[in-house]
Regions:
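C-terminal motif of bacterial Sec signal peptides marking the signal peptidase cleavage site
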Residues: 18-20
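Bacterial signal peptide processing site
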Residues: 22-24
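Zn2+-dependent metallopeptidase catalytic core
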Residues: 55-79
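Catalytic zinc-binding patch centered on the HExxH motif and its immediate surroundings
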Residues: 84-103, 108-117
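Active-site recognition of the HExxH zinc-binding catalytic motif
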Residues: 104, 136-151, 159, 163-167
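Short pre-active-site segment immediately N-terminal to the catalytic Zn-binding motif
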Residues: 115-136, 150-154
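Post-HExxH zinc-binding segment in Zn-dependent metallohydrolases
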Residues: 157-196
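Pan-zinc metallopeptidase signature
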Residues: 200-285
């Protein structure tokens, strides 16, 4: 969940109070930061010694740097920092507009790993279940940051929009990385949906229900390439009547990203990213 953007709302309200005859600024606004300066990373020392291994593996995989590299193609007007931190025992992640940070908690990563271990998964499925949710959550919270910093208008729940942003971004990075990350993220939502007893708070929450998020991820993936993502229907139980409309859902989401966010993408930074990774960008799975 993103922190409320009170300061942004206040600035917009104040701007409406300025007199129409106010003189124009004599200096042009400062240019946005260069790609390398747009998104920084911080690995904070974990408070719990049991999380030390998570820190070492994340650093070794350059986990935050890989995500920052992708977000860096967006010409954000202010720097953004991705932080891996301890959160007083709480498994969470959030965007803080006042500090310009996206925080991912060690406790959250530990929870993903515990869920995967308890399911006794093997091979790629085990790696995806442990790593996919972490990547997806970080991109989801970064979506809140992009919406805030670019002043992206949102029709509907911002949490749904952040899920869509993360999913479309992954799909545009490449089918392979998207398959593994989205499979892991959806698996996590499916596991939580299976064990949670729903109450009034779940239905009133800003976030969609875990089961809804599970199907939404697979629907967008399937809609982007029904042949490649056929397992969404064949193995992961996306209902056929929902699957029939997923192509349209994906293109609707892609159109929104192209209209609202793509104009802020730095084409040179994007090309450097493509050349560097040769279309096989890997999020450290």
């Amino acid at each position: 969940m993103s922190v409320r953007r009170a300061s942004t709302v206040a600035l917009l309200a104040l701007s409406g109070l300025l007199p129409a005859c106010a003189p124009r600024a004599t200096q042009p606004p400062p240019p946005p930061p260069a790609a390398a300066e747009r998104v920084g990373v911080v690995y904070r020392e974990p408070a719990d010694p049991a999380h030390r291994k998570i820190l070492e593996e994340a650093r070794g995989q350059r986990f935050l740097e890989r995500v920052a590299e992708v977000l860096g193609v967006v010409q954000l007007p202010k720097p953004l920092t991705l932080s891996l931190s301890s959160c007083d025992g709480t498994a969470n992640a959030w965007y803080d507009p006042e500090r310009g940070t996206v925080t991912l908690c060690y406790e959250y990563l530990a929870e993903f790993r515990q869920l995967a271990a308890a399911a006794h998964l093997e091979g790629a499925e085990a790696r995806d279940a442990a790593n996919g949710p972490a990547v997806f959550v970080l991109l989801h919270e970064s979506g809140h940051a992009v919406f805030d910093l670019l002043q992206v208008p949102i029709l509907g729940q911002e949490e749904d929009a952040a899920d869509t942003f993360a999913t479309v971004l992954l799909l545009k990075l490449g089918r392979d990385v998207a398959f593994h990350v989205l499979r892991g993220a959806a698996w996590s939502y499916g596991q939580q949906a299976a064990v949670r007893t729903l109450g009034e708070g779940d239905f009133a929450d800003q976030h969609g229900l875990d089961a809804q998020r599970y199907y939404n991820l697979f629907c967008l993936a399937y809609g982007s390439d029904p042949k490649y993502f056929a397992p969404a229907v064949q193995k992961y139980h996306l209902p056929e009547d929902r699957a029939e409309g997923c192509r349209e859902e994906y293109h609707q989401a892609l159109f929104a990203v192209q209209k609202l966010i793509a104009p802020s993408i730095d084409p040179r930074a994007l090309e450097r990213l493509r050349v560097k990774h040769g279309g096989a960008w890997d999020l450290g799975r």
